[in-house]
Amino acid sequence: MYDPARVRSVGEEILDFRHKAVPAALQGLRLVDFGGLGLGRLQTPLLTLDRDALDVNARLLADWCEERGILLAPHGKTTMSPELWARQMDLGAWGITLANAAQLRVARHFGFTRLMLANSLTDPQAIRWAAEQASTARGSSPGWIRRTPSPCSTSN
């Protein structure tokens, strides 16, 4: 459902000017080394996550969904974190929900195959790309992209 090696590779990314909270003095570090520096070395505003609390919440939601027979496709667009998506998939999520073609490309780069689009693609190039992905996504079903009725549509 995703490529574990690609997801792990995120931690090896070298931090630079593209990373908002990284002071110039810390650029050049790998992301995996950056996390242990402590909050005092980071620029604000900055959002941090408590790994233990995140794990507890992810497990609670996964268990709740499983007990009720619910297939969960959490919003990946909120975090844009392949590592978090992988954790959710490992805990039983059916797939990941995204909002646009750029977000779909990120997910496909990391090998995610069960993706739900919570929007309509209107750009012809994005539609062609998505159709190509649907035909080649490893581990996907022919329904990788599904048409769902729109509440605004007169014909379903």
Each language-model region and where it sits:
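N-terminal, Lys/Arg-enriched amphipathic/low-complexity engagement segments
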Residues: 36-37, 43-47, 51, 57, ...
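Active-site-proximal beta-alpha core segment in soluble small-molecule metabolic enzymes
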Residues: 73-156
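Gly-rich Lys/Arg/Thr-decorated short loops/hinges at beta-loop-alpha junctions or inter-strand turns
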Residues: 36-43, 87-88, 112
